[in-house]
């Protein structure tokens, strides 16, 4: 980021709002932007055109004491999105910093709908009283129309710092990321051919996901190539009992090491009786008398 990268726009090409004073607020408060007149919008609508913001400049000019502290947060929202997803870009800068904020849109909107962009500000961690007219905001918009929407190269938001006592280390800004997309396969009558190499095309009764490696597939006994490429692709169709390899080698080894002798109660009694009798006989034998010579 460079505070000198962005040059002031040519006012002749921009729609300018009034430079109005705004009261300090800890809650998001709207900054009024000047959009094309109703007649201009109607003309574009009759020509079946859509519109986008090429460039938006928000000028902030502070009017607070020299010892004022706090941060100003400015946000651009797209009201076509749900409330928790409408934020598109935001800036944070010191309350005493005169600054120009630059935003470049990345989407078109239909003139049949209300203009979706809203601009808000709020002040955080400040020692200035609420409802004090702490600054003036002015917006400049450059819009364009097109017969139909096209992909717009992304241009990041930036700033132009006007107060010499502040630098790029004192400000911050961000932009929303691209929305994530996950393809959801369509189930259809024919789901047999998968992973086919060739142009992106489908046959009657097929979906594109069914013809790619992402879609689920039925067995294709006629395709030896698929069997070679994906030899285990249909194992999920087997029952869990067939896929269960059984107990591990360590468990089997422990079981083999354990004694596996079974005896009836009569056999156990006979074994004990015999062992006791042997002990008695061995301990009660009379010792032979030694002969005297």
From Swiss-Prot:
UniProt keyword Glycoprotein present: no
Mode of membrane association: Peripheral membrane protein
UniProt keyword Membrane, yes or no: yes
One GO MF term: DNA binding
Function: Transports viral genome to neighboring plant cells directly through plasmosdesmata, without any budding. The movement protein allows efficient cell to cell propagation, by bypassing the host cell wall barrier. Begomovirus genome is shuttled out of nucleus by Nuclear shuttle protein (NSP) and the movement protein transports the DNA-NSP complex to cell plasmodesmata and facilitates further movement across the cell wall.
Family to which this protein belongs: Belongs to the begomovirus movement protein BC1 family.
The name this protein goes by in its record: Movement protein BC1
Source organism: Abutilon mosaic virus (isolate West India) (AbMV)
